[in-house]
């Protein structure tokens, strides 16, 4: 078998095209109008419309409403859990991201744990999280549990 050498490499057939020379006589196939058709803005030198121009009709970018606000470059994401999701946990149990994953309450984490106050705290729980809403903290402590904020 012949070895492969750099000087023997050739481009794939059909991948390279010779530059089309237009306006060089009708026998060349692109003479006279050079493939631009008869008259009109698109046949003129420098002719053509700007991107988004729709012939005088109100263009799409003006028909749509302006978008308010902006998107954060580095948005914060948290793992959210509500009190109603913790109702089946046994009393006086430690609650953190790992125990919630083991219990099947969470299936994945997307950042620090935030406890929200939707629902009721039925049993005393020792919850460790990065953030508690005021209503969640109030309900947990009213049920005899503790809220520990992790750094």
Curated annotation (Swiss-Prot):
Residues 26-38 have a biased composition (Gly residues). PROSITE patterns: RIBOSOMAL_L15. Residues 15-24 have a biased composition (Basic residues). Pfam families: Ribosomal_L27A (PF00828). Coiled coil: none annotated. GO terms for cellular component: cytosolic large ribosomal subunit. Gene3D superfamilies: 3.100.10.10. Keywords: Ribonucleoprotein, Ribosomal protein, RNA-binding, rRNA-binding. Residues 1-51 are annotated as: Disordered. Transmembrane segments: none annotated. GO terms for molecular function: rRNA binding; structural constituent of ribosome. One of its GO terms (biological process) is translation. It comes from the Bacteria. Belongs to the universal ribosomal protein uL15 family. Part of the 50S ribosomal subunit. Binds to the 23S rRNA. This is Large ribosomal subunit protein uL15. The gene is rplO.
């Amino acid at each position: 078998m012949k070895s492969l050498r750099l000087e023997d490499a050739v481009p794939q057939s059909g991948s390279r095209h010779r530059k089309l020379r237009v306006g060089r006589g009708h026998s060349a196939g692109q003479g006279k109008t050079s493939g631009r058709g008869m008259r009109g803005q698109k046949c003129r030198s420098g002719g053509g419309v700007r991107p988004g121009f729709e012939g005088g009709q109100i263009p799409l970018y003006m028909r749509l409403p302006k978008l308010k606000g902006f998107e954060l470059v580095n948005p914060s994401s948290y793992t959210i859990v509500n009190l109603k999701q913790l109702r089946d946990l046994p009393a006086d149990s430690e609650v953190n991201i790992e125990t919630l994953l083991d219990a099947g309450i969470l299936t994945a984490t997307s950042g620090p744990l935030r406890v929200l106050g939707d629902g009721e705290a039925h049993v005393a729980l020792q919850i460790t999280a990065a953030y508690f809403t005021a209503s969640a903290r109030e309900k947990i402590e009213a049920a005899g549990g503790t809220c520990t904020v992790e750094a």
